[in-house]
């Protein structure tokens, strides 16, 4: 309270959905805002210091006096450069470059300082720094630290923001997490994508300076638009924060264009290869950046084997049928998030080969029931049909039917539809357990060729309806009957919920992600004894799986259950550190602990599967999109009478709002960034209401409607011609409501 000023820090890396390059800048931007809250004029001095860390790999420890010694250090050089409105420390070394800049006019500097005491003494005298303008490593294995300082005066009530920018450029850096076991991943060499755009850290810095207004204003516009949603804050936090995975060491992008995703970031063992049975849960990356989704699908298909298997990991030959089907569904998602059919025509031959492989190997009699030994994301092998992988199979078949129709492969479309038709019937009849009130696994063999199978039997499995989760996101329709689907979801919420209270005696079979008092949902629970050969992770709690289950509940309007799950997850990632002694992560997991709001964990931090959280947004807004058909739709399950939510299309994002009264309904699609071509609009009227006098306006100008119809509560509007909705433009739909 004695400090006469109020100081706040805003730190970010530019994040602009649809703009991949400007969301992949190697930089950190720090805005320090100071406000004079006193009655007198005050003088402020700010100091920023940075070690020249070029050469530090992350594997070793920085040691020695003033912590300037590390294995990769040596030949590090600092140089002060000044120009109008900016002073920088250029930091170079054999491994690349860094740059710390102050975007201000009155900046003092030093290329090197001896120790913290001397730096503080120099700065405290008059708020300015003295020292050499160049410096270099005194010895092999050592580096130097530089600093910048700037000062200004504020009148009472006045405030000012000073921006510091730290940029880096490491063309020879290692990719991925702190893991030496995957250094032979075939695509690791060849530099970083940003080498195609900039030459060094100074080049990066100058790009930021020249484009600062766009980068900052558009990043903030994205944040403002996302949080203009009236969805609860805890849900928006979890939906949006998991995009941090794209900003973490979990992800890399090579100069040649290969987009690599580790399962996570860890200081020990972590798995690479763009793991399909983990990655297919992720939704946020493809919705915010459709270009990334298309790159990943093309990579998946590039790795297809001669027989048609999509390997669990790029460059391998191990199957994982959940990931196999998930990748096929991803192809259809990426098609829907395109502007035309070109992507699909390119991908269809190998996509068809992949679904045909699965049919021939696991469903040779084409009855929709899977047979034989198959691996999955639970790191085990199973045999037979579970509702989990069974629904994924059905959803993949339906997606392939739709894709075949688009490319004109009618014979394939009819074949997939025939298998789907008998498959959903057989699965519904054979997997439903009336006594338990949910679907169960139909195990086939306990052992195949000496390999012990893992079973779920009659477990309430959190992924029980994962294929339906996918199907609803892609508007593929219902798989199992709605009443049984909702009954099964209710059982997941009730049976698998667990709170780790003091004295509960909870002991996870492998890893414990729950702190004392935390609540989560187990992977499996059983009505009786736990089978001896059950899955290893049966009583673990992992958010990536929970989001998928919660979002499926939300898709069916089960708001109490679905939002309960998301709120409990948000409480676990509330910023309170849960470390060893409270949780048990196992050696190959996030041994640092858990609780970070910006890095959810499983087998490591910033876990890829957690990007499934974006599906909650899609479920709450009832989003429907088909870019090539120029179709957009919203059927909110969250407050349809007063709804607001962020949305993305193939090239744009914005805010959707909807209001309903007893006699009228209005919906607005406000584009904030990019452009969308639209010809068809889908909306939902309240139950037992019929729409009348439909009007469509683009920024107040009436648009001609070719036709409109209502099927149940779904209103379909077909415009007479395609309209282009640009940033700053709002498309408004209004109609009367008549009680049936």
PLM ranges: what are they?
Residues 29-31, 649-684:
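Carbohydrate-binding surface patches
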Residues 43-51, 672-690:
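Surface-exposed beta-strand/loop patches in extracellular or lumenal glycoproteins
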Residues 8, 13-27, 31-275, 404, ...:
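Acidic/polar, glycine-enriched structural segments that form the non-catalytic walls/loops
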